[in-house]
């Protein structure tokens, strides 16, 4: 079990016409037009229940599995929890008996894995600067006071149904070390699909919402490919080695 909590409290003020520029106190100034004080608090919390299983048989066969259930305060309580995990396995082929006479293979491993991962981060633009949106599912307002009257101005349109962005990843490949470790590397195929992308969707002014966008889960992304990583020793001497 794990829990993370973030709380950031900010209080600041400003004034003009400093009497002494080396004294940073509001009472050291006589300004009226720019006299101002503001404060805000950011709250964020995640909670997770996790487990992991690892198995090794005879130094040749390896299995692993993990599962976690996470909650994020960025989402409404009805959509706060997500289920994630992974499974993987590896076979150290060079430890098999049929490889005993294959001297030019120092290590040969076949590996594969599948996993699910979640993302809850969504940014918001405040005064031209992007920062974390800690309350993405809630409508957010600015308080305005003029002529003795209070008013609320909508600055961010929340989405109650917002939930985790989820990525599914599959990898299969091989690691190898050959020719007395002169050549080693990895060949791996990967496939990654992300669903329920977290995105600030633009909305028309005619909707009556002046913020210009609202958070939503929209669209999928698919990435596939092959990765090749090779390292070789070109020259090897008693006191030196040249690799690339």
Regions found by a protein language model. Name each.
Residues 1-244:
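Extracellular/periplasmic, surface-exposed regions of secreted and cell-surface proteins
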